[in-house]
Amino acid sequence: MNYAQSGVDIFKEEKAIKGLLSSIKTQRKGIGKPLGGHYAGMVEFGKFALVLCTDGVGSKVKIATDLKKWDTVGIDCIAMNVNDALCVGAEPIAFVDYLAIDNPKSEITKEIGKGLEKGAKISNISIIGGETASLPEVINGFDLAGTCLAYVEKDKIITGEKIKPGDIIIGLNSSGIHSNGYTLARKVIEISGFSFKDKFPEGNYPGKKIGEVLLTPTKIYVKEILELLKKVKVHGLAHITGGGLRNLPRLNNNVKFLINDGFEPQQIFKFLQKFGNIEDKEMYQTFNMGMGFAIIVSKENKDKSLKILKKYSDSEVKVVGEIKKGKGVEQKKLGLKYSG
């Protein structure tokens, strides 16, 4: 099985996005002038760039509803946005959420709010507003998304253009699937004969239901990345989300990202691959496969960066690869290559 067969075609999505962008031409001048970006968009604001990014939790919310456990999807909503904002070297400061729901119930919204609050606290941001829309004729269940505001001094923007052969790729491990690939994950559970309420098989995740493992919140990398940026000149930052390793060339398509010592994927990935009969290449271009965030620094800054990240992060931190001449991404152990 692959992601497209489960209902999500990432290549079709890319074409659709290009179609949308082809219709958008208006650009402001002066304050608010677009400054580009990759994971997040930037606009002119004096000596600063204001940074905006929008993302959602996706179909992970369907599992939350199935288990009637809504208290962590708010963390995911915050995480998906603040982690993207970090990728241009920006510090997240504020957030607005968007909740579309078929039948607003306080017992659901209160739990969603708990997760949003926890995510905001971890990220040190303020939730300053939002929108809750009751859409019974449009939506079945609910959809949760948000927008993050961040800022960065213009001379400290990180675009990835400084990435060069010889640089080192440092990885921070993920907590699991995070918030991407859930349409495929849910399809695997469906065809395998399991349910989200079943205990996880084969002795992994003792006592936990499959759905509980899948609801593990997305890691938030704000603290350790901001501390690193204070002390090290970072060449590139990548949030490993939908598209898996194919996220890396977004930073710089004129070099090759060689992953030669990646993280061991958590058991949830092995479970999905086994019962979904999913090929390695599809797994690594759909899921994060154990690595939630990547940092590219010069070889000279490797040890200093590792020391800082290990001090401030509760994630596993290690060198996962290096930058070579060429293009795209290579996962050396499995012989996987992606053009980006």
Please place each PLM-identified region on the residue numbering.
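Glycine-rich anion-binding loops of enzyme active sites
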Residues: 21, 44-49, 57, 76-77, ...
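Glycine-rich, charged/polar anion/phosphate-binding loops
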Residues: 38, 130-134, 152-158, 221-225, ...
